Curated annotation (Swiss-Prot):
GO terms for cellular component: plasma membrane. This is G-protein coupled receptor 78. It is found in: Cell membrane. Changing residue 236 to E: No effect on constitutive activity. The chain crosses the membrane at residues 8-28, 48-68, 81-101, 123-143, 169-189, 243-263, 278-297. CDD domains: 7tmA_GPR26_GPR78-like (cd15219). It comes from Homo sapiens. Residues 1-7, 69-80, 144-168, 264-277 are extracellular. It comes from the Eukaryota. Residues 340-363 are annotated as: Disordered.
Amino acid sequence: MGPGEALLAGLLVMVLAVALLSNALVLLCCAYSAELRTRASGVLLVNLSLGHLLLAALDMPFTLLGVMRGRTPSAPGACQVIGFLDTFLASNAALSVAALSADQWLAVGFPLRYAGRLRPRYAGLLLGCAWGQSLAFSGAALGCSWLGYSSAFASCSLRLPPEPERPRFAAFTATLHAVGFVLPLAVLCLTSLQVHRVARRHCQRMDTVTMKALALLADLHPSVRQRCLIQQKRRRHRATRKIGIAIATFLICFAPYVMTRLAELVPFVTVNAQWGILSKCLTYSKAVADPFTYSLLRRPFRQVLAGMVHRLLKRTPRPASTHDSSLDVAGMVHQLLKRTPRPASTHNGSVDTENDSCLQQTH
């Protein structure tokens, strides 16, 4: 294993560890909070995080072994099963992101009718369609024996068949990426554009109210006025930043792998192994980006995490420090000294006799 493969293996280990931890946190938050579970977006997020968790636990270790050893798993039939999971989970993740973007558009564009338009039951039906579509493509690839170890990507996934089957395989690959990449990207862009329009209208209304309030409050302190203007600028760019991050992560993670897969179909193109492994690692990094983009950085999940940490800290007993133990010992000694009578000294006795004699003389 050369230095390039060692760097890619280290990158894959980091992606695997962060993906396991972040997606497990999302599932733990949804299991802890009943409010998150009953939302339609919560059902979609559970499906997305569960798929990423399975990808990190079952698929990424085999790719790591392929990078380190450069060969297929020794167990018979294991590579076909891992390739089936890889195709299914990648397609399911892309379609789940499209469903989440549609859910966000309905929540922002139709806030009063959102609960009736997309209930958890309808979200389950939507996920059933996504699962059925992903299973159809994975089952077709498994039935045609197109799943196996690909040395260009060091993973168990789709591999090039012999020359007579290349046209069918090319049509299947183009259809798979059209449904699993182009369609979710189009849905993501269209719904994000609608969300951005609604957010821009809301920002314009809030800016009008803010400017009128600043014009009426003439004696307002300049620092407060400047703070209001800064918040106004942040409010304008907040929706654009969130939408841009969602689209950019989707493109950065999926586009290199999809383009490499399509270029692999050209007869005179040979895929470099290091580039193929890097593009595969980028697809795995979507399992790291999605929990932070759609879950952990949002306010409901932050509140649930804070509540879980607070409850955990309340249950754990505090270890007694040396300062507290010294105070306890001092208190015990003080109570003991208060209970024991003090012996009268000779000096105090002489002073008492002198006081008694002085009192008798005055009387």
